[in-house]
Amino acid sequence: METALAIIGGGPAGLAAALAARKAGVEDILVLERDTVLGGILNQCIHNGFGLHTFKEELTGPEYAYRFIRQVEEAGIPCLTDTMVVDLEEEEGEKYITAMNRKDGILTIRAKAIILAMGCRERPRGALNIPGFRPAGVYSAGTAQRLVNIEGKMPGRDVVILGSGDIGLIMARRMTLEGAKVHTVAEIMPYSGGLKRNIVQCLDDFGIPLKLSTTVVKIHGKERVEGVTLAKVDERMKPIPGTEEYIPCDTLLLSVGLLPENELTEERGAKMSPVTRGPLVNESMETSLSGVFACGNVLHVHDLVDFVSQEAALAGKAAAEWLKENGDNITEADLVLEQAEKQETAAGRMQAEKTASTAADRELSEKTTESSKPEEKESHASHAAAQEQQKHAGVTDVGLEYQEDSAAGKEDMWQEKRTAITVESGAHVRYTVPSKIRPDKAGEETLIRFRVDNVLKDHYLCVSYDGELISRKKKRILAPGEMEQAVIRHSDLEKYSNLSRITVHIEAE
């Protein structure tokens, strides 16, 4: 099986990326989804609050997903559901995906470009090292959400929730609405990990207490959870003796973090961020692996699905551009016109259009010819092999780009490019996405998304170019649970021809 663009994941990121790629001109797209239906995690998120940025109206999770699913179906984009991707490989510039499903067994899919949109998973109890037995009644918040919203089953009636991530906060409200008693939400950090609006709507409105700097130190019960012991923690996250509190319950829900599903990415050797546990990407969402893009929660955990869709659309469009640059679904005339768009003078534009017209006529003539010339095929094959050899030799890494000029007898031309600019996190910033910006590839503006490391009030969001402060914007409050963003405008980058480093940092008043 072959495809120009393979998208791994049929959730909100994968669907948005597929639509963006199709709109950008990619006809050959294949979406691979391990679940039996498209939509990803949105199918179990029956609460509202989705779509305010994308559709300018408030939707539930399934409604938001259905709008994208319908567009994908109308666009005729093929999707393989109930299909698990188990391996990614690359040989001689070709990417190979190994997947399996019940109908076809083992599948090998050759793709020219890949978009990773596998989402994330919840951190399990085993990662917490909580003392006690392993009784029934301990669930991740996402599992409990699926049981209640999809399968119609109640995990328990007396509930304690550990962790104040958005899923945990939403499940506190959901369990209460279903008749359960939620005793408390305990959070080991001195601040909540979820959105402020979820704290208000899911806890405050229902009288559910939030205990900060508190964790579960013991789970009681052998066959079924009978209760938990909570304790305060110090600044090193160690339980403080004498602060223990026993709460009887039959269910413990864990909302203690999300981990991007990046086993495939790591096995392929992509450069990874130790903070987000996702791949490092440039302004086009391209990883360190050429032609492999990433978006959504597989890249870094988002709090709003609208931002996932925006990021995925960027990845889809960038993948389409990458395919065009690498000779897929693009004619010789298109290449000449594309080069003309980069020329500044009107004379250059007119000459290129004339050349493009000639190239288009020649292509039409060649298509009507019954027989092809073997020597021309050999010439194109050797040229492609030489281009691939140049790519492997690291030519593109040192800032040079190959272009073909059919009007000049297909002479080799080299266009100098500026070196990629490193984007780094400064004071109180945990990470930045993207981590590189290529000025020649950046659009009118590039969004840098990041999270802070603590709750900060009346601070300034600052952006510096090689240590020089460029912008300083006051923020009334910054919190780790809410993603922030800074805008880098291309017009500003043009003023700094030798720029090597952009730093995003937070300053006090």
List each model region and its residues:
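Beta1-alpha1 glycine-rich phosphate/pyrophosphate-binding loop at the start
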Residues: L5-R67, Q71, R146, P155-I199, ...
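FAD-site-proximal beta/loop scaffold in flavoenzymes
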Residues: L116, V138-V148, T251-H302, A385-A386
